[in-house]
Regions:
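Short helix-to-loop capping/linker segments positioned immediately adjacent to catalytic or ligand/cofactor-binding
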Residues: 3, 18-22, 104-109
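Short beta-strand segments
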Residues: 11-45, 59-63, 72-75
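Covalent nucleotidyltransferase core used to form phosphodiester bonds in nucleic acids
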Residues: 4, 39-43, 47-52
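Short, basic/aromatic recognition patches
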Residues: 1-14
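Short, structured beta-strand-loop surface elements
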Residues: 46-124
Length: 125
């Protein structure tokens, strides 16, 4: 039996919806990898989604296309910010999943001494 975690972890893109202070949803299509019972996303530490997750970890996730068109119903989840070391592991996992596209992102991310961030996402049962 395929679980929502299986579907989301295998998706090419994940629609990660965070929420502003006033409750306004902010959907963002992102690459995703599965790590055990958690989904993981790599991002820049100054991204708006990081700021919103820092304030409240309440998010919704759904599989989507490259431009963010959902391919399924949203699932409630809790997001947490991971360490920079975890961000490096997430970036390596993205290379494994996305091949050349992932390598290009890793190359750009590792140029210079730019900080990295990762988000861990746990589905709410």
């Amino acid at each position: 039996m395929t679980t929502p975690l299986d579907v989301l972890g295998q998706a090419d893109y994940l629609l990660l919806t965070t929420f502003k202070k006033d409750g306004t949803p902010v959907p963002t299509p992102v690459w995703v990898v599965r790590h055990g019972d958690e989904l993981r996303v790599w991002t820049a530490p100054d991204a708006g989604k990081v700021k919103r997750i820092r304030r409240s970890g309440k998010v919704q996730v759904a599989p989507c296309g490259m431009r963010g068109k959902p391919h399924g119903s949203p699932v409630d989840a809790v997001a947490t910010l991971l360490s920079e070391e975890d961000a490096d592991q997430v970036l390596d996992a993205l290379v494994q999943k996305y091949g050349l596209r992932g390598r290009m992102v890793r190359w750009g991310a590792r140029r210079g001494d730019r900080p990295r961030a990762a988000i861990g996402i746990t589905l709410v049962s």
